[in-house]
Amino acid sequence: MNPYGNIRKVPLDYEGIKSTAYAVQRQELDNRRGLEWKECGIVGSNYLLVPNSEVKELADEIATESQLTWEPMKTFFNGKQFAYFMQCKSDTTEIAKDDDIALGMAFWNSYDGSTALQFRTFLVRLVCTNGMITKDFMNLMKFKHNKTSEGYEKQIINAAKVVDNCGDDVEAVAKRMRRMVETPVSLNDLAVLRNSTLGHLPVTLWGKISTHFLQKESSKILDNDVTMWDFYNACTDILWHDEKPTMASLEHNQVITDKLLGAMA
């Protein structure tokens, strides 16, 4: 599925009666039928349709003009929602020995109005390339898909200048992560987490995370040497490297990150 194919907004009508709604269509190549238009959302007449290709071009421009060195990391697209992630390759921050994090920046968009056009910064654990998405502890700027966001390009470029001055934010989050390294976790603690802080997680997702955690850290658990940092990384392992990622994967990543970082005050 090509996230950068052509898109258009087509007025809807019924038996000659025009509607105020519009269909958003994206062009996709079918192996048998060739190029065809597929509907990916219904929006209002004032909906500002922003092509993913423009969002990526904007991201690449910001990366080029930044004082830091960036490279593409990950692209998500499900036909309607889009996210483009980049990782800083020039600066790192230590959490524990041989365990560093780096700054990331992300750009989100949607063709059906379900996700705001947005710029955000996040963090990357280098040893496993896990992305750690947060709304509460890093930068986030959203733009509505309407006329109030016309000229969004300049607004995002100005907002994204913060990437060159994120050192204090990164260090503040790093301090909380170092507290995770120092916070022991028992199986009883996991039960408490499940019934309180992470009680919102779907049963299937909790099962995947807890199974992965228990298998990955089995020897450390037997030695009572497992930490909140170990558990948190089991969460981001599952969510960031999901073979069939969804927008929910990114949203759960954000909520878990904010909940666990928030507990490390």
Predicted features by range, described:
Residues 70-91:
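Beta-rich nucleic-acid/ligand-interaction surfaces
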Residues 1-18, 74, 89-265:
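Intrinsically disordered, low-complexity regions enriched in serine/threonine
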Residues 52-69, 73:
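Glycine-rich, compositionally biased intrinsically disordered regions
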Residues 1-58, 243:
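Feature for intrinsically disordered/low-complexity regulatory segments and propeptides
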Residues 42-43, 78, 160-162:
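A broad "ordered helical/assembly scaffold" signature
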